[in-house]
Amino acid sequence: MKKGLVLVGEPMGLLIAQSEGKLDSVCGYDLAVAGAEFNVAIGTARLEHKVTYMTKLGNDPFGKRIVSVLKQNKIGSEFVTFSKEKSTGFMLKGRTSVGDPDIFYFRKNSAASTLNETDVEKINLTKYSHIHLTGILPALSEDTKKAAFYLIKKAKEQGLFISFDPNLRPQLWKSEEQMKSTINELASYADLVLPGQAEGKILMGSDDEKLINKFYLENGAAICVTKCGSKGAYVSTKDNENYMVDGYKVKKVIDTVGAGDGFATGVVTGLMEGLPLKDAVKRATAIGAIQVMSRGDNEGLPTREQLNVFMNK
């Protein structure tokens, strides 16, 4: 069964500060591309899997750059469309040597926020074996929220393997309560849920990885893997498997943004290849470690050769 992965989401232009300092005082920025599902698409394609990505872009330089990156990485873009009225979203990202960088979004009323049920109905899900969704798509607008529910329910009906990463973006939601209820409802349709400990604290009231996993298994998932930062990840399955997978030590953390998407890439591609779950999660911790040593959101995502070298050191 080699059908490939389909993703739907919002990619953005990414302006990365060239020096440390507040975003309003930095003089220069480097241009890249970002977006949670976009990062997973790139990571999966670099590991030589068939990937298709759906989004809506503005007819602007950011949109054209995104299409160029999709083509460079051989990602299927037949479901990428352009809006005549709306622009591609973009974001500013600071540079820091300690903790997470400052981020500022320009994505309200973006082209991707107009994606709707009619758009996603065009995807013939029977052509794919896996779908990866995040909690960002339903946060963009009422239309994208309906589209996310349509997709995840349809994928469930069609028997695709569904992975879901909460990817919390509180600033995009009307309220924390709406965010929690929507994301936990979407997660109930997923086979695999990939929360972080801090996300667990918000979504179900605890940052204890064992309790987080218990919650999502009872919520409907077959597998829950909670990311525990540099410690690694805690795995639980409906078959009563429970274990920790240790993380990799890194020499220097440069940028933590994108590490979770790298982690998702590792688990999803591992399962697509039929690896045992523990090995897929070990791959995930490796890709997450590689990504935190890179400046951009997806530049560090490895090829198969680079991944093998890192894991066999």
Walk through the language-model features, giving the residues of each.
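Short beta-strand/loop segments at the ligand-binding rim of alpha/beta enzyme cores
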Residues: G159-P166
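Conserved phosphate/ATP/ADP-binding segment of small-molecule kinases
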Residues: Q158, P170-N242
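Short, conserved phosphate/pyrophosphate- and ester-handling motifs at nucleotide-, phospho-/glycolipid
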Residues: T44, G196, G260
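Anion (oxyanion) recognition and catalysis
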Residues: A45, K71, K153-E157, A187, ...
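Conserved N-terminal subdomain of the carbohydrate kinase-like
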Residues: K50-G135, N308-K313
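Glycine-rich phosphate/adenosyl-contacting loop at the front of the ribokinase-like
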Residues: M1-G76
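Conserved phosphate-binding/catalytic region of the ribokinase-like
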Residues: M1-L5, K153, E209-K313
